[in-house]
A protein has these predicted regions:
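Conserved, charged catalytic cores of large soluble enzymes
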Residues: 51-102, 126-143
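Short, hydrophobic, well-ordered secondary-structure elements
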Residues: 44, 48-58, 115, 119-122, ...
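Secondary-structure capping and boundary motifs in well-ordered enzyme cores
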Residues: 5-9, 35-46, 87-95, 107-117, ...
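Short, charged/polar, low-complexity loop and linker segments
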Residues: 27-32, 96-104
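Basic, alpha-helical terminal appendages of large translation-related enzymes
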Residues: 79-81, 104, 108-110, 119-222
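Catalytic adenosine-cofactor/nucleotide-binding cores of aminoacyl-tRNA synthetases and other
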Residues: 1-75, 183-206, 210-214, 218
């Protein structure tokens, strides 16, 4: 049964499912239906689509080379409901705080919760795309620096997330970094102590020109 799962979903997808669906001190349930659901929602959508969209936009708007420009949302204030409009600060707070949260979960062997923290980072990246709307920024030439900052923030955030993911899904982490740092994937590897820092990526690094699909969506009926 385990070999069948690996043949269909791949080793890292099975790793993710088993680690994520086995709560601390409780029994877990493994089924084809749950595997497909997790594959599609978490791996294909939340993670795979995020990486693909970020690389595609980086290539479309900047030839693959996105840079820090300083055009951030500092001082953006709040909306009519009192919600912060400083999207950059909120994203960076989640990214730089994830390392400590993962450490705390792992100290008590709550592996599923540790992985959930990492995927919360990826979900926040997807929300950041919705908030900043890069496609709209691209239509305004005066917003070019802002667009570059947004895409840089996404690439940097994914880099941190991919490094945190390494112990749980090593092949996936390696594939992500190979796409974000194609000339030298090792450049994307961070020391664990640096995973609460933001902005370590150099400006002159290009992402891959041809992003690969990390996880394909599956149809349960097939």
């Amino acid at each position: 049964y385990a070999d069948d799962l690996v043949d269909l979903f791949g080793v890292d997808a099975v790793r993710y499912f088993v680690l994520h669906e086995m709560p601390f001190e409780n029994d877990g349930v493994i089924s084809w239906e749950l595997m497909v659901e997790r594959m599609n929602s978490d791996l294909a959508n939340t993670l795979g689509n995020l990486v693909n969209r970020t690389i595609a936009m980086s290539n479309k708007y900047f030839g693959g080379n996105v840079a820090k420009t300083g055009a951030d949302t500092t001082g953006a204030g709040t909306d009519e409901n009192g919600a912060s409009l400083d999207f950059d600060a909120e994203l960076k707070a989640v990214v730089t705080g994830t390392k400590a949260r993962v450490e705390d979960k792992m100290k008590t062997l709550h592996v599923a919760d540790a992985i959930t923290e990492i995927f919360t980072l990826f979900k926040r990246c997807n929300k950041y795309i919705d908030e900043t709307m890069p496609w709209a920024l691209a239509k305004d030439e005066t917003k070019k620096d802002r667009l570059s900052e947004v895409l840089y923030n996404l690439v940097e955030s994914i880099t941190v997330g991919a490094n945190l993911l390494t112990p749980y899904m090593p092949e996936t982490s390696e594939r992500i970094l190979a796409q974000l740092y194609p000339a030298n994937p090792k450049a994307g590897e961070r020391d664990f102590d640096d995973l609460d820092k933001f902005g370590l990526r150099e400006n002159d690094i290009k992402v891959t020109e041809k992003p690969e699909i990390l996880f394909a969506r599956l149809d349960l009926e097939e």
